[in-house]
């Protein structure tokens, strides 16, 4: 019985996708370019909003099942990071701006195409760390970004 169960559910494990959460579509777009269909992405907001909005508990439950939360390091994104971490202590919180030199007074570094390439590199490195089986796939997509 256990063997049958294992045989039936093995394909699900082999083809399962990592769930990733982002704050808004720009982060999702970059991740999709590198990971393509290898991850499932959920967005907290469909556009950038500076005010913290309460998320329904059913949505928080869905979001907190993610393996990674990518964000640009903005204050609003950090608030959502705390909320997700409370619900799932295992979630990786990744600040995509951690090694990027920002201009004083302008936190919107992603508008610079050269810095956006650094953001893509950060995403690539994290994806490779969590999914070592697809290193070449991610590398090819990252290089074509």
For each predicted feature, which ranges?
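Extracytoplasmic metal-acquisition and chelation regions
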Residues: 16-145
């Amino acid at each position: 019985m256990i063997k049958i169960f294992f045989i039936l559910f093995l394909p699900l494990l082999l083809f399962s996708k990592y769930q990733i959460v982002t704050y808004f579509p720009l982060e999702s777009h970059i991740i999709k370019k590198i990971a393509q269909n290898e991850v499932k992405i959920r967005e907290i907001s469909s556009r950038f909003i500076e005010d913290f909005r309460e998320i329904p508990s059913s949505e928080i439950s869905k979001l907190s099942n993610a393996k990674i939360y990518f964000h640009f390091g903005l204050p609003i994104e950090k608030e959502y990071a705390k909320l997700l971490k409370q619900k799932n202590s295992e979630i990786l919180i990744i600040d995509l701006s951690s090694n990027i030199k920002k201009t004083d007074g302008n936190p919107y570094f992603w508008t610079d195409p050269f810095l956006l390439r650094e953001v893509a590199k950060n995403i690539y490195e994290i994806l490779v760390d969590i999914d070592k089986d697809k290193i070449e796939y991610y590398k090819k997509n990252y290089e074509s970004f």
